Swiss-Prot record:
Intravirion side of membrane: 41-100
Subunit description: Dimer.
Source species: Influenza B virus (strain B/USSR/100/1983)
Role, per record: Putative viral proton channel. May play a role in virus entry.
Name the record gives this protein: Glycoprotein NB
Virion surface side: 1-18
Amino acid sequence: MNNATFNHTNVNPISHIRGSVIITICVSFTVILTVFGYIAKIFTNKKNCTNNVIGLRERIKCSGCEPFCNKRDDISSPRTGVDIPSFILPGLNLSESTPN
């Protein structure tokens, strides 16, 4: 029974470090993809928002890009309050202050 002693100091530190590095790379890759996804969504919504078309002062309603639809010279629908981008709070539409 004395031969059944376990020595816990023989753990390979290189394999432990390698596992930690792999987990760190995977988490970092996921975070980077998420950030790039949000940036791509912002630019896609910004490109689709056109509210001054050939001199017409019309505010075109576009879902998901209300903060970018309100240009400086757009006076058709004045808005008050804090402008919260809809991609931060997808379930709440707090950026519109005018009732339907």
